[in-house]
Amino acid sequence: LRFEMLSLPELDLDAVDLRCTLLGKTLRGPLLIGAMTGGSTEAGQVNRILAAAAERCQVGFCLGSQRPMLDLQPQAVASFSLRDVAPSTLLLGNIGAVQLRDSLGARQLQALAQAVGADGMYVHLNPLQEAVQPEGDRDWRGVFDALRQAAEQVQIPLLVKEVGAGLGPQTLAQLAQLPIAGVETAGVGGTS
């Protein structure tokens, strides 16, 4: 995406209103601080700073993968508990698609969201990242069916994202078949 510079805009820039509504929350502009980290004390400190910034700037915030919460580690839960610093922020939880298939049903997915006060949940797709990690999840069979089942049963908005390789046309066509609230298209390039 490239923007063309318009040096003679013929408008009052102070009159431009970028506010939008996403999942029932009003944002100052169509911006979301993307998922980066979570699970450890240090990650919790980063999340708190970012969530407070999201609150101050009135933009959304997406948690890093909540996979560490599945082990019920106290520091993991604490690192994702941010409502005290971001009470009105659009807050989105996040779990991997393989974890959805292997460990979670709709009720557990909803419980993950409720545990952190999330307004919705992302399910992240990352087969390329997993393929190059020695300990990565290499079996992706049944992930689409698990995603479909969760989307049909969960009582919170469900969104899908890719963590660094983007969503191709075939994947988007598959996702269009599901009753999900949306997809994040910022996947190419990760958090850069």
PLM features per residue range, with description:
Residues D14, E42, V46, Q73-P74, ...:
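Short secondary-structure boundary/capping elements
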Residues R56-A97:
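A gly/proline- and charged-residue-enriched helix-loop-helix capping module
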Residues A51-R56, D84-L91, V98-S192:
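Alpha/beta enzyme core
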Residues L1-L23, L27:
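An N-cap/entry alpha-helix motif that binds or orients negatively charged groups
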Residues T21-L72:
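Active-site cofactor/substrate anionic-group-binding motifs, chiefly glycine-
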Residues S7-P9, G39, R67, Q99:
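Residues that cap or initiate secondary-structure elements
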